[in-house]
Each structure stands twice: as C-alpha cells, then as structure tokens.
Amino acid sequence: MSEIPLFKNVENDGLDCRLFGYICDLEERGGFYDASEVYLAKLAQGFAQVELPVTKMHLNWQGKVQDGVYATEAAAAANFAFHTLDKIGVISSLSLHIKGQAGNGTVLLCEARALGISQSRIAPGVYEETYVIEIKIT
C-alpha cells in the first residue's frame, strides 16, 4: 500500500487547524473516497471543495460521465461542508439538474456551501437541525 496521501495540498481558508486536520484524516482513511476518486481541494467555515478527475470508470456507454458520479461528488462535498461546521450530518434529500455532461480527462470541481440552518421541534426538548447546502459542479 502506498504511503502517499489521497489529498494533495488541501487549502485551508481560515478553518481551525485541528478541525482541518481531522477532516483531512477522514478523507485519507475513508476507502469510499479512494474508490470513487473524489479528492478534497479546499476547506473553509461552512464550505468544501472537492475534485474528481474523470477516468474511464466514471463514464457510461456513450462516453459521458454517469449521473451517479455527479451525485457522489455532490454528496461528498456536502458531507465535508457539514464537517467544517463541526457537525455530522445525514443527507436526506439531494436533487441535481445536469445541464451538460463531461467526458474522459475532465476534472469535475464541486463546491458545497452551507447557506442556512433551521431548527424544528420533534418532541419536547428534542430538536432537529436542517442545513441548506448549495452545491455547484463545474
């Protein structure tokens, strides 16, 4: 097994260094990110940027990126954005509108930004926090 970390020069834009290190460690040890080839690029408070270099394994029979690849990258970016708020979240709803499709050799850059938070009462003394995450893939 290679000792080369999965992330390369992840940019820290003002995030606490301990939280930054924790998130980078999560990515490095997470086999999911290694298998899907999603790489962490930048972290800030409420913000995460990931990249995915498109290879043949990401393509459908037409030579275009499969829709599930976009969803995987978007979910990864959203999860990292949750972590920058020092929270752990679950994605309960994700909808994508794909305007165009990338091909082999493209690097998909995905940004996730926490826009807002709302709280709803589930039971007396029990609250659920809902985060709105804006995701942009270029």
Predicted regions, residues:
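Compact, glycine-rich, soluble single-domain proteins
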Residues: 62-79, 91
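Hydrophobic beta-strand-centered segment that forms part of the acyl-chain substrate-binding groove
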Residues: 79-109, 114
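A generic structural signal for short beta-strands and their flanking turns/coil linkers
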Residues: 34-36, 46-48, 90-94, 106-108, ...
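Non-catalytic linker/capping segments at the edges of enzyme domains
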Residues: 1-51, 55-57
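HotDog/MaoC-like acyl-thioester-processing domains
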Residues: 1-17, 102-104, 109, 114-138
